[in-house]
Amino acid sequence: MSHVELQPGFDFQQAGKEVLAIERECLAELDQYINQNFTLACEKMFWCKGKVVVMGMGKSGHIGRKMAATFASTGTPSFFVHPSEAAHGDLGMVTPQDVVIAISNSGESSEITALIPVLKRLHVPLICITGRPESSMARAADVHLCVKVAKEACPLGLAPTSSTTATLVMGDALAVALLKARGFTAEDFALSHPGGALGRKLLLRVNDIMHTGDEIPHVKKTASLRDALLEVTRKNLGMTVICDDNMMIEGIFTDGDLRRVFDMGVDVRQLSIADVMTPGGIRVRPGILAVEALNLMQSRHITSVMVADGDHLLGVLHMHDLLRAGVV
């Protein structure tokens, strides 16, 4: 396209709002297509013993990829297959235990219609999503989901806009309906998103990130305050645990306790750790979620916490560990 000048006074905001208005109207009309066919499609996907295989060409293919990804992350195993690649060997990935969702606004995609006889021969259930109930794909489908729109938001009526939005929303409707039917939980979602923030919050446990072994700052009750301070400095966690030879907790001493000792105006060189430690101390179990430990630490205004099984010291968790793990 050759370079053109911007029309004086052209209103980009108005143009954008017109698109939103058109697509809102189209989505409102989509409600009529959440019907018995929608129920049948959901049932086929719910009882599918294999995977939901999504196909689509061009823009429908882009929507199909997103649809498959949404299914897969919400409890419905799914993957995308490009129709052209399917015709040259990738159809071998499809089994009779699967369900195929084929997407085409016109319902006449030659790449997909060429695959339908093979899918029928394999007895693979076929769900077609099109904008034309009278199309070849709609008539060949076991279940047809209509996503017909009154007009595209593109003023030329050429670029897929309203139609792709309608298809995307229909896919979301299928995914969320199945999610609810399966009783899919946030914890289930986290299992497929271990690298995301939600995954870290719902999967990461204290024993995954706590300090253990030689990294644990600890001294005996008979230690001097000086020796305890050296241990605090060496381990760099802002605290030390006071425990016996069997790692049974007797108390804790933090940098906050040290400030209080200085405020007392006593000779710190003459003190033992037993004189200034806090008996007992707050602790958490190793198997709790890291985010639970974070909530406790924030509510108690502490930066570190002991990890223990009863009184037996197992580790120490610091706020910095939670930050590094991405829990905060």
Swiss-Prot record:
GO biological process: lipopolysaccharide biosynthetic process
Alphabetized GO MF terms: arabinose-5-phosphate isomerase activity; carbohydrate derivative binding; metal ion binding
Catalytic activities: D-arabinose 5-phosphate = D-ribulose 5-phosphate
PROSITE patterns assigned: CBS, SIS
Sequence ranges assigned to domain CBS in this UniProt record: 210-268, 277-328
EC class of the enzyme, as a word: isomerase
UniProt-listed Gene3D superfamilies: CBS-domain, Glucose-6-phosphate isomerase like protein, domain 1
UniProt pathway: Carbohydrate biosynthesis; 3-deoxy-D-manno-octulosonate biosynthesis; 3-deoxy-D-manno-octulosonate from D-ribulose 5-phosphate: step 1/3; Bacterial outer membrane biogenesis; lipopolysaccharide biosynthesis
Positions annotated to bind Zn(2+): H82
Catalytically relevant, annotated site positions: K59, E111, E152, H193
Residues forming coiled coils: none
Function according to Swiss-Prot or TrEMBL: Involved in the biosynthesis of 3-deoxy-D-manno-octulosonate (KDO), a unique 8-carbon sugar component of lipopolysaccharides (LPSs). Catalyzes the reversible aldol-ketol isomerization between D-ribulose 5-phosphate (Ru5P) and D-arabinose 5-phosphate (A5P).
Subunit structure: Homotetramer.
Family of the protein in this entry: Belongs to the SIS family. GutQ/KpsF subfamily.
Protein name per Swiss-Prot or TrEMBL: Arabinose 5-phosphate isomerase KdsD
Species for this entry: Shigella flexneri
